[in-house]
Regions:
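Interfacial helix-start motif at the membrane-water boundary
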Residues: 41-64
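Alpha-helical transmembrane segments of multi-pass membrane proteins
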Residues: 15-31
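Cytoplasmic juxtamembrane regions at transmembrane-helix boundaries
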Residues: 71-94, 152-159
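Non-coiled-coil alpha-helical tracts in long, low-complexity regions of eukaryotic assembly proteins
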Residues: 31, 54-58, 62, 76-77, ...
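Helical transmembrane-bundle signal
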Residues: 10-20, 62-72, 93-100, 131-141
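Alpha-helical transmembrane segments of multi-pass integral membrane proteins
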Residues: 97-159
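Peri-membrane helix termini and adjoining interfacial loops of integral membrane proteins
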Residues: 30-41, 105-114
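Alpha-helical transmembrane segments and their helix-start/interface "positive-inside/aromatic belt" motifs
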Residues: 1-14, 80-90
């Protein structure tokens, strides 16, 4: 049901993560190539082997979160399953926030220097904020789904 506020939060979060994944993938991989070549990681193959699956997971995590948020909109009649899917996407989104902090800590200055215009640099800074906004939206949707479920349960008790 799209008229419910939690569905709008989930749809907005899904859209933001899809845009984040689609437009940011090229710059994301560019930043990971920079992180792999940092001086304190040079010659340490074990850390590089750890980074390779991390690169794969974090490049497709926004797409996964986007799909989960979109799918959970259609579980409006099965609230427990909707809450479960939202919680999974919330935890993935929280991990994405931690990864964003770690990623941009090492590569922000380099990526900002690669941006061809000031507009693209502003878009880079918006990409930093995007996972945090989406995490808040997913949290709010979980809160409103629980509130909706409590309302339905209280009406069932009255009958």
């Amino acid at each position: 049901m799209i008229q419910r506020i939690q569905s709008l939060f989930l749809l907005l979060s899904s859209t933001l993560y899809l845009v984040y994944w689609y437009y940011g993938l090229e710059w994301y991989l560019e930043g990971f190539n920079l992180i792999k070549n940092l001086p304190f990681l040079a010659g340490k193959n074990t850390i590089l082997y750890i980074l390779d699956p991390l690169i794969f997971i974090t490049t497709y995590a926004p797409l996964t979160i986007s799909i989960l948020c979109f799918i959970s909109i259609f579980f409006f009649k099965i609230r427990r399953r909707q809450i479960l899917i939202c919680k999974i996407s919330y935890y993935l989104s929280f991990l994405m926030c931690m990864n964003t902090v770690w990623f941009f800590y090492f590569s922000l200055n380099y990526l900002a220097s690669l941006m061809p215009s000031m507009f693209m640099e502003i878009m880079l800074y918006l990409a930093i904020i995007n996972p945090f906004i989406c995490t808040i939206l997913i949290y709010l949707s979980i809160k409103f789904i629980k509130k909706d479920s409590d309302l339905v349960n209280s009406l069932n008790r009255i009958r």
